Structure formats: C-alpha cells, structure tokens
C-alpha cells in the first residue's frame, strides 16, 4: 500500500491521464469540468467527448480580465477588433472566440520592459553600488571597502558616478 499510493498519485498528476473512471474529468486546462448538464450559474465552453465543459462565473471573469488587461500588447489588431465587437454579441459566442484565440497567443515575459534594482543581502559593508538589470544583459553588484574608497578618492583618474537610469515609461492601456 505504501508503494501503491505514490504511483497512483504520480499517474493522476500527469497531464494526459484519463481520470474519467473516478468522476474527475476536467477540461480547459483544469479550469472546467465535464458534465452532462451545466449548472445555472455555469457556462458551456467546449465539448468533452459526449459531455459539456462547464466553467463557473469566476473562471469566466478571470479569463476575460486576463485577455482584456493582461495581453493587449500581444494580440494583433484583428483580434483586438474582434474582442471589441464581441462585447456587443452574446456571452457564449465571445467565450468561444476567446478560447479559440488562446492557443495563438505567443508567450511573452511580463517583466520584459521593467528594470529591477538588485539589493544585496550579504554582510554589512560601508557602501555598495547598486545596478539595474536590463533585459538580455547580466550585471553584477559590486561592493567597496574603506581601502577601495580611499584609493579612488586619491587617484586622479577616478571615474564619475554612473548616470541614473532613464525614466521607466510603461504603456497605459
């Protein structure tokens, strides 16, 4: 029994394992459930072989908000126009259209246009130079000690402090 449970659990967690025999048939990447009939507050999104893929109102709202606010820069112009015109049509047609568009969306990094500040959590130092990270470029944090500060103050070739990074401009939706 001790060996049977981990094997069964690992099989249940795999993506393509059929779990219909215990009544846990899922659809829409685990957000929906396959049923004969959807409840009053649920919406039918797809077909599960002979059943309907039913999704609750929270999942519908989550998908709608993600498509409206999370991916406006990723979608091409045709899809954006279709989404705008779909607001006037029935909710079922809109959801079916949104779900057909989901596989076409390219994955992008949410943090692609954002600069991060690295703050070291190491031992206490006298001073530290903190640098920003730009996409595709790796920078390292350098720390200076008292002896390095005295040498750089005495030398005539000490470099000026680095210029501040450009202001971060994010597109507004």
Curated annotation (Swiss-Prot):
Protein's recorded name: Beta-defensin 129
Ranges in coiled-coil conformation: none
Principal location class: secreted
Disulfide bond positions: 27-53, 34-48, 38-54
Organism: Hylobates lar
Subcellular location per the Swiss-Prot or TrEMBL entry: Secreted
Signal peptide: 1-19
Known role: Has antibacterial activity.
Chain intervals for the UniProt region annotation (Disordered): 144-173
Family: Belongs to the beta-defensin family.
Biased composition (Pro residues): 159-173
Keywords: Antibiotic, Antimicrobial, Defensin, Disulfide bond, Secreted, Signal
Biological-process GO terms, alphabetical: defense response to bacterium
